[in-house]
Amino acid sequence: MDYTQILIKPVISEKATDIKEAANQVAFYVLPSANKTEVKKAVESAFDVKVDSVRIVRKRPGLRRKFGRVVGKLSGYKKAYVKLSEGEKIEFFEGV
């Protein structure tokens, strides 16, 4: 599998910002078929950093939600929390 296609986009949320500052971790949405070693290699090759560990969280699809009168389904996704080595940094939105 091509490592450039594994990482879909970074997670932009309050929790992701907090763990980035506190624990030197970065969160990404990844392909549902990706595993920990593929995510580690993809981050290391894309951003030229050293990765200590990877944790993966999967949200299953199909939960029904009401959006006013409309009932819909939520799609599933997979997130990876990547812990970077000491002194390593990935800068997404610095200076924004």
Curated annotation (Swiss-Prot):
Looking up Gene3D superfamilies in the UniProt record yields: 3.30.70.330
Name one process (GO BP) from the record.
translation
- Give the matching Pfam families: Ribosomal_L23
Q: Looking at the keywords, is Ribosomal protein present?
A: yes
Q: Which GO terms describe its cellular component?
A: ribonucleoprotein complex; ribosome
Q: Which UniProt keywords apply?
A: Ribonucleoprotein, Ribosomal protein, RNA-binding, rRNA-binding
Q: Name one GO molecular function term.
A: rRNA binding
Which family is it part of?
Answer: Belongs to the universal ribosomal protein uL23 family.
- Function noted in UniProt: One of the early assembly proteins it binds 23S rRNA. One of the proteins that surrounds the polypeptide exit tunnel on the outside of the ribosome. Forms the main docking site for trigger factor binding to the ribosome.
What assembly does the database describe for this protein?
A: Part of the 50S ribosomal subunit. Contacts protein L29, and trigger factor when it is bound to the ribosome.
Task: Identify this protein by name.
Answer: Large ribosomal subunit protein uL23
